[in-house]
């Protein structure tokens, strides 16, 4: 898989979690399967975890899991998006395309 395709997956994942305000892995996968990127194949937990680590490394965004009341993933440090104009612009412009 090309690096640009993986990067698009990071953007999609970040954007989906951010816009939802909290999302279960099941719901995330339901949305994922409906994208062209997925090819109709669900995202494995291993892939999700690798993407989650890469997103933190590249964008500085921490995707955490709220275990109480269900397992919901959310961006713990949303202020990074609000305070870092370059990262915000990049995520914004790439999530539109």
Can you say where each PLM-predicted feature lies in the sequence?
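Short, basic/aromatic recognition patches that contact phosphate-bearing ligands
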Residues: 1-96
């Amino acid at each position: 898989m090309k690096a640009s395709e993986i990067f698009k997956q990071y953007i999609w994942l970040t954007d989906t979690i951010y816009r939802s305000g909290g999302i279960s892995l099941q719901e995330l996968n339901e949305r994922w399967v409906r994208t062209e990127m997925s090819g109709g194949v669900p995202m494995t937990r291993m892939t999700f975890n690798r993407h989650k680590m890469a997103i933190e490394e590249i964008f500085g965004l921490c995707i955490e899991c709220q275990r109480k009341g269900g397992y919901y993933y959310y961006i713990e440090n949303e202020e990074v998006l609000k305070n870092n104009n370059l990262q915000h612009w990049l995520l914004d412009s790439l999530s539109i395309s």
